[in-house]
Amino acid sequence: MPLESKPIGGNAAMRLIATCLMFFVPTVALSEPIETQKIITALTGDWNGDGGTDLALIVQTEPTEPMDMHFFLRDIEHNYLKPVEVVRDQILGEWNGYDRPGYENSDTEPELTALPNNSIRLFLPAMPVGSQRTNQTLTIAYRDGAFVVAGFSYDSEDYLKENTKAGCDLNVLTGKGESGKTNEDGTTSKLPVSVPGRVIPFANWSFATGLSGCQGS
């Protein structure tokens, strides 16, 4: 029977997270304390395909600063969630104040979805600044002991102008994909993308890297 993978929230999320944090060891760099109020979203799944239930968290840091993504793999033999990687400076989103005074709840937050092939879909919505908005989606997979970007897609539009939509869907590992844009007359043009495949750790990823691949360079 396949392992069920799903995002979690509310009390269920807090119970799982609290259980996870019980196993943090202060002497281990990856096992840093996490304030539960700063956890934006959590996702369970089997990232390394060993049959255990693993965990991914997106955690706020400070206002105006990028969020962190924490990855845990279950140690099946000893039955605990082991922190294996923290990726910083990759995730933007509005600061969510929850019940803290001086901050409002946000409506621009990253989203996590578990995929059937043990990978993670990370949706990064456009920040509400200016008229040009670009949403990004990354597919993150565990390969050879690290979390890498297996797929990249984006869609952009200038909401103050007509016919400005553009987008791309790229398999980073194979270098194959498709790009498209809306022309001035309202028609849509699509072009195949073919570049050398790459294995890029999530920690080293940049939007410019994905955009360059979509442009065939």
Predicted regions and their residues:
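Beta-propeller blade repeat segments, especially FG-GAP/WD-type strand-to-loop junctions
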Residues: 64-89, 139-144
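Beta-propeller blade termini
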Residues: 38-47, 99-118
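Blade-edge motifs of beta-propeller repeat domains
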Residues: 32-35, 77-104, 192-197, 201
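Short, surface-exposed coil-to-beta transition loops
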Residues: 54, 66-68, 107, 132-137
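Acidic/hydrophobic-patterned starts of short beta strands in beta-sheet-rich repeat architectures
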Residues: 49-59, 116-124
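Short glycine/acidic-enriched loop and turn motifs that connect beta-strands
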Residues: 62-64, 129-130
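N-terminal signal peptide c-region/cleavage motif recognized by signal peptidases
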Residues: 25-26
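Acidic, small-residue rich beta-repeat scaffolds with periodic aromatic anchors
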Residues: 111-217
